[in-house]
Amino acid sequence: MVENIQTEADAFGFFGNYGGQYVPETLMPAIQELKQAYQDAKNDPQFQIELDDYLKDYVGRETPLTYAKSYSELLGGAKIYLKREDLNHTGAHKINNALGQALLAKRMGKNKLVAETGAGQHGVASATVAALFDMELVVFMGEEDIKRQSLNVFRMELLGAKVESVTEGQGTLSDAVNKALQYWVSHVDDTHYLLGSALGPDPFPTIVRDFQKIIGQEIKAQVHEKEGQLPDAIVACVGGGSNAIGTFYPFVKDDVKLYGVEAAGDGIDSDKHALAINKGKEGVLHGTKMYLIQDDDGQIQLAHSISAGLDYPGVGPEHSYYHDIGRVKYATASDKQAMDALVRFTKAEGIIPAIESAHALSYVETLAPTMRNDEILVVTVSGRGDKDMETIRNYMKQEGDTHA
């Protein structure tokens, strides 16, 4: 057991030094309303029953824990299990949170949603639940991401969402969050901000974490059923950090090694990366204090990753806290390392992972061979690679791969 870990935000919304509510005064009533509504929902067994029913019959939970026999043999060392979030309806972990927050919005009497999206997966998940519950949805998406993920844009529109292109800044996820927050400020009476990652002002990091912790809860039960023990190590990719915090949270007080993998882009020594923890420092963005990529003057730097879902310049407050206390080790994977792992894994297991998930797999390739073959390593496959086929093909063409 690992003792003395803060597992809930304090009264001011902080995990250690990170978190808080750095928002304009105009938003505070909405934040307080959300916090109260969430507390009420959390204490209402009926809310949880309704959520569980939708997760089971609509999303398709629980997701399998698949033994990666060929990949384990290829790498040598640990026995590798895959947590298959790629098999959720809509193809990623994002639906867990979108569904929970949509039910919460309904409970608050709000029939309109606003969301941000990077890779488009959270946008698709949000559009899906908006269609399911007959709610209006506006999605803000960076211009650059719209180019990279045109198929997901069409999916969102087909589902009835209005997709707004964000041209400010770098035209990526960070800019989309800015616009979504601005929109929420002016439509706060009838609109809920369906934030997609474990960031933003308190209570968002806690809400998103709680709706994603089903990943880790299922892993714990499934490994116990298959192996009669806890896993020895768990690996997940980290952008804003929602799939990773959902994976790690049920294990933070257990004797289990936890590894988050950040996107190193062109490389850890380049200036094109998304290494908020490994190369960033403390700062405030989008309503919360967390690790951020900044220059020497404290200006927030542009994040870069081949994965549209990981190119965010910060990492949520709970991850920032776990890094500081040494509970989670944050490793890195470059674009090349992630893509190489993606190809190896796909050929070994017949599963095409999202590029985000391939960052976690890249670190598995480093970690697994250092472990004994009776040790258990679980990696969260946060999403499937369908949305990334164009990016993968273009990358392989550039690399001169004959399969592209």
Curated annotation (Swiss-Prot):
Coiled coil regions in record: none
Modified residues (N6-(pyridoxal phosphate)lysine): 94
Cofactor(s) of this protein: pyridoxal 5'-phosphate
UniProt keywords, alphabetically: Amino-acid biosynthesis, Aromatic amino acid biosynthesis, Lyase, Pyridoxal phosphate, Tryptophan biosynthesis
Pathway(s): Amino-acid biosynthesis; L-tryptophan biosynthesis; L-tryptophan from chorismate: step 5/5
Broad EC category: lyase
One Pfam match: PALP
Record keyword Endoplasmic reticulum present: no
Extent of the signal sequence: none
Enzyme Commission code(s) on record: 4.2.1.20
Entry's Gene Ontology cellular component terms: cytoplasm
UniProt catalytic activity: (1S,2R)-1-C-(indol-3-yl)glycerol 3-phosphate + L-serine = D-glyceraldehyde 3-phosphate + L-tryptophan + H2O
Listed GO MF terms: tryptophan synthase activity
Family the entry assigns: Belongs to the TrpB family.
Subunit relationships: Tetramer of two alpha and two beta chains.
UniProt function note: The beta subunit is responsible for the synthesis of L-tryptophan from indole and L-serine.
Name of the featured protein: Tryptophan synthase beta chain
Species whose genome carries this gene: Staphylococcus saprophyticus subsp. saprophyticus (strain ATCC 15305 / DSM 20229 / NCIMB 8711 / NCTC 7292 / S-41)
Lineage: Bacteria, Bacillati, Bacillota, Bacilli, Bacillales
